[in-house]
Amino acid sequence: ESFDDESAAAFRRWLVEKYGDVQAINRAWGTAFWSQTYRDIQEIQPPRAMPTFYNPGQMLDWRRFSDYALRSQMEREREVIRRYSDRPITTNFMGTFPLLDYRKWAPLCDIIADDSYPDPADPQAAHDIAWQGDVMRGLGDGAPWLLMEQSPGAVQWRPQNSPKRPGQFLLWTIARLAHGADGILQFQWRQSAKGSETFHAGMVPHSGEDSPIWTDVVSTGQALKSLAPITGT
């Protein structure tokens, strides 16, 4: 989300296109309550810092606008790419991320692609993987999808970053295939030496190839080779 002046102006234009005028916006948002009535469209701002509760009508429209703005950018990028290439076009989805309406994004993608980072310490993670895989296949009308990102080990952004247990990387990879994935990609190949994701696991960790992570990566790759016949199903 962006709350700058340019985004605020675009939000107001979107509202006028949707509702017609500021009076209709007032009615839709119920601004008479708590004396929030707007007299001019220029008074309307994105839902920035508030001393108390946000207006839910304003919040809903703001999130719909934010989704529209991002999706419009992808549409423009898709148009440019398509002028020069007939290769499949996609972008990273993030499971059931609540701020984007993936049902509207899916028609822009030639193949549905997802990022998935369940917590290895969460006993519900297997259910989340199954649900997320089914959602992706549903967004593609039953077609196979692509796992764009998963971690071979621990991430770096949770309060507690649990490593994957032995065999868990293979198990979760196979689970994605069972729920319709046609390809499995990892983030990242070699663990970063510096930067914000220094402690995010890589296929080749800081300890090198003589490590449990690399052993799991190799065994998972061998398993995927043996499952090649199910490609496209």
Question: Which residue ranges define each predicted feature?
Answer:
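Polysaccharide-binding and catalytic clefts of secreted carbohydrate-active enzymes
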Residues: 1-111, 115-131
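Carbohydrate-binding surfaces of carbohydrate-active enzymes
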Residues: 37-48, 75, 83, 95, ...
